[in-house]
Amino acid sequence: MQKKVLSFDLTGTLATFSFCDAIYFEGLPRLYAARHGVPFEEARAYLKSQYDTLGEEIPEWYDIKYWFHRFGLGDRWGELLREYVPHIEYYPEVPRILERCSREYELLLITNASREFMEIETAPIRGYFTQTISCVSDFGEVKKTSEFYGKVCRSLGRRPEEITHVGDHWQFDFVAPRGHGLRAFYLDRTGERLGEHIVHNLVELESQLI
């Protein structure tokens, strides 16, 4: 009998924001400061203003190659990602939860991060997943809409009711998948929200799946 699918968001769900923040607010500003001869803090403020100008709803926002080109930093983006590998950090319960859940489910990863980012950030846990999906790299989309989850179902050859998704964004990881018929859980690590299908860590998720 085919296992059902358990789908995870990445940043804020499995991984903290440490790696992403280090790349965008330390690594890129450091390279920009060195290339253009400006103080680091000035470079960081300028780059942040440029990130805000483009906005997170544009696919290029998630593309490290785009920012290297835009800021005149060459093409050695892979070196920067590898340099900041020590900043990759998972929430404490993640390894054991993935190990246990992988016995009962096919694990899927769905993220807004570009594939270049995702491949580096998930390397230590990649073996738990049967498939990984980057909204930006694989579908050219930045929002996980109900229609997006429909595309995911079709690409997997699965019915919506065969997939459970969990993530930390109310709209993209909870409302949208439920809108297409998936079972979904909202992960609120702040503990501020309470209710059915709301969990505060992945240990609580595991108990809900039983």
Give residue spans per PLM region:
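Asp-based, Mg2+/Mn2+-dependent phosphohydrolase catalytic module
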Residues: 1-6, 99, 108-210
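N-terminal helical cap/lid subdomain that shapes the substrate entry/recognition surface
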Residues: 2-96, 116-117
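Non-catalytic interaction surface on structured domains
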Residues: 90-95, 102-107, 182
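A generic short-segment signal for beta-strand/edge and adjacent turn/coil regions
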Residues: 33-37, 76-79, 101-102, 132-135, ...
